[in-house]
């Protein structure tokens, strides 16, 4: 690899809402610069997880180095850092933005600006990135570039005089994009002579080489064989492999300020090479770490239990391996009276939870029971202590707590005018507080609500999509905790509380939720040899109950006529057996029952 001066390096990323054609555009850029052989080219080249291809979304961050001969005759190195577009992964976006000097803002010319685009653009502006607007999909019959340019200027306030019209699918406008990257995105500052500081923006676990770290050199130079020090985890390593990603890994001997690459150093766990950490040299440590890193905090929690108790160790190993690749996944062991041993896991949001669950089942062959998601509540005890509780069964007794506070999020929805009414109704049903409503261009509106996170994590997104026929988009971020009259709703099956079905709900909604839970469980739990009562209770007060009738064998089938006392004797014997069975028998609760909590109809 030839050494390219920092002046001819460009580090950029692509910001786009889900489905606006970001991965396809990345493919075209790789092809146009000859980085990937035509023979090896496949769609969504940078999305290398099967799950990403299937869902058509980007989850893990990828990076690619492209060599580009610009029109001015100079050879440039373009480092493309791909970013995910989904709201759950905004922490991954902020990491990749910190490694760039510029961004391509890709907007679908037929759909216009969506909520997520907006959120990511604000992140990019916070990092002072140069933003180049690109209108994608202009080959579609419904494309309205002029309207969308107006939207970008009005909503985001970006000057769109230099906006590029493109179609990644047809390959239109690709050379213009590459030229714009060279001309408009500033080169990284030339700080080769300073002490080494490099930012880790991703890492993944390789079973042969240990953790492979993707990083961007901010200052100084790093060489193969250097002993490096990671400032946040306070660990030392020797670099035994160093290289660049183009997009497959190519070894090099050294990387200078402004370059993006990877290294391997026999690191055992990703927790030791945290994303956002600063790399510096052991013998010439930098004075301070790079700014702008925040720990990704999980917002949604749920219990994961193996259906087969023998798989507990396998689940632990699988979670450890996923954790190697996923800095935001948290877990701790948990025991449940109904389901035995499992883990309490923390996620960034619902999509993150689904993806982790799907990867556990698909890549590690596990059969899991997942409990309903819950959020982190803040409990102020009578002694004035603050407790953070992510599991309803850990809630202190009513006389030990003064108040419960729940997290609120600010939800911004962008929707066509037609659906404003139904989305307002949805938000109000979810205890939302109306904050703002703005009319954008031609029949599009933004709605701003403050809604408890617990109401958003279950199925708010699905409901919003179905009510707006898929046209609305949303984005949310945490705004803090507020006090509400919340109660713990216990579900008892056959007289025993099932801790995995317990939840914390608003007092006004408790009766409705308890009622529908009991009805749903009655449908889903199979009939047993004895009568099974299902009760929903708050404290010791039962607020809803249902019964699953017993299956009974016809013990009188063999009596033809004959004495009534003989029949009575048989019936009494059966009743006695049922009674004994009721006291010792266990009720089998299927996985669907736990999932039912997710799909309670509360829209």
UniProtKB/Swiss-Prot annotation:
It is found in: Cell inner membrane. It is an enzyme of class 3 (hydrolase). GO terms for biological process: positive regulation of translation; translation. One of its GO terms (molecular function) is GTP binding. Its main location: membrane. It comes from the Bacteria. Signal peptide: none annotated. It catalyses: GTP + H2O = GDP + phosphate + H(+). GO terms for cellular component: plasma membrane. Keywords: Cell inner membrane, Cell membrane, GTP-binding, Hydrolase, Membrane, Nucleotide-binding, Protein biosynthesis. Its EC number is 3.6.5.n1. InterPro entries: EF-4, EFG_III/V, EFG_V-like, EFTu-like_2, G_TR_CS, GUFP, LepA_C_sf, LepA_CTD. PROSITE patterns: G_TR_1, G_TR_2. This is Elongation factor 4. It comes from Trichormus variabilis (strain ATCC 29413 / PCC 7937) (Anabaena variabilis). The lineage of its organism: Bacteria, Bacillati, Cyanobacteriota, Cyanophyceae, Nostocales. The gene is lepA.
